[in-house]
């Protein structure tokens, strides 16, 4: 049961991370690249 709870927890953390990155990412992309935010986020994380 604890593992099942961890599954949604991980998803929630991912969503929160994306939301946090969406702020600065929008400024960099211009706001129109919201669709590629997820792809950009991965690259950003690697460079960061």
From Swiss-Prot:
Bias (Low complexity): 9-18
Pfam families: YuzL
Region called Disordered, residue ranges: 1-48
Lineage: superkingdom: Bacteria
Protein name per Swiss-Prot or TrEMBL: Uncharacterized protein YuzL
Source organism per UniProt: Bacillus subtilis (strain 168)
